[in-house]
Curated annotation (Swiss-Prot):
One of the record's GO cellular component terms: cytoplasm
Residue pairs linked by disulfide bridges in the UniProt entry: none
Protein name according to UniProt: Glutamate-1-semialdehyde 2,1-aminomutase
Assembly information from the UniProt record: Homodimer.
Cell compartments where the protein resides: Cytoplasm
Pathway involvement of the protein, from the record: Porphyrin-containing compound metabolism; protoporphyrin-IX biosynthesis; 5-aminolevulinate from L-glutamyl-tRNA(Glu): step 2/2
Necessary cofactors: pyridoxal 5'-phosphate
Lineage: Bacteria, Bacillati, Actinomycetota, Actinomycetes, Mycobacteriales
Similarity remark: Belongs to the class-III pyridoxal-phosphate-dependent aminotransferase family. HemL subfamily.
Main location: cytoplasm
Amino acid sequence: MGSSDQATAHARAQAASARLFDDACAVIPGGVNSPVRAFTAVGGTPPFITAARGCRLTDADGNHYVDLVCSWGPMILGHAHPAVVEAVAKAAASGLSFGAPTPAESELAAEMIARVAPVERIRLVNSGTEATMSAVRLARGFTGRAKIVKFSGCYHGHVDALLADAGSGVATLGLPSSPGVTGATAADTIVLPYNDIDAVRQAFAEFGDQIAAVITEASPGNMGVVPPAPGFNAALRALTAEHGALLIVDEVMTGFRVSRSGWYGIDPVDADLFTFGKVMSGGLPAAAFGGRAEVMERLAPLGPVYQAGTLSGNPVAVAAGLATLRHADAAAYAALDANADRLARLLSDALTNAGVPHQIPRAGNMLSVFFTDTPVTDFASARATQTWRYPPFFHALLDAGVYPPCSAFETWFVSTALDDDAFDRIAAALPAAARAAAGADEGNS
């Protein structure tokens, strides 16, 4: 089906996905293994994806979509990139897991260290949540302090201490935190408004000798894209250093996506610890945390801070990550930036023509669509946007063969695989989607 055909085909087949969703709900809570996938924020039945190649997804009903989610960020080269598939197949043929060191683990760590100057040592783990959890534990062990400062709307995985006022699925579902997080755990977390350096100064004035670390997304993408104000991350570095606390920069989303060196390549602030995921795993379950040697060498077996994982450094995931990073060259990052520019222009033109108030903030090649005339600078202003316009906008795009993020608080991601046919489909779909947003009824939100 051509782009113009599917852009006007509003009777998208869904029977197979609906049946699969019912089956999933019978055995998996909510039918999904990560809450945002359930389409809670936009309604309807999530398509069940059966295949992907390049920038295109195929669902169980045979519908095809231009992918603007990219598995929530990792797929910078597109799906089933030949070099990544070949590397994974070769690694899998040699064995899936050994519970022992492998040469490729050190190669991946060295590749990451070469890209982010302050990182001198890397520890591989299995998820971004595990990376931030371990970084927080290490910061507490290194400083001998308990309190952690985080920011409203920043999401660092489902770590108990960091779920308070978080972004991503917590924002999508409208949850302030999560049942099961104890008061004692929450008491050691100080939550501050994002981009408010005066609030950080006040926190250090009150609790400075108790604060182990400040953790921040390098450039937040879990309340939508809300870049740091100029100098904000540098000011965090200065304040933490002044008070003997560590700075943890979460680059799980931005790392090796927005530049060869992640957000560090755009805003080079020398944090004590960084967390990574998504791109560095090539789409398989792997993540990492790293930083200066003095801190990292407090980890077991060299030091007393314990961290371990049966599948950490999994050879198949490491192979996918290495292949992705080695093919993410200057041309790839130029293509990502150009594709993000092109997508942002199409979005803005369509929404402007339909008279829809909007902001399209950027963090390198990451972007978001906020329905508002007012710049979004923190979680409060993100939540104040006209989110009720998003579900009809989303579904109009989905019905026309374009797959955007299924929440107003999530990031839009591009890949190098986006081609002219994909952009033609997006361009054909956007006018009707913009009109749907313009005609949205706040009372139905």
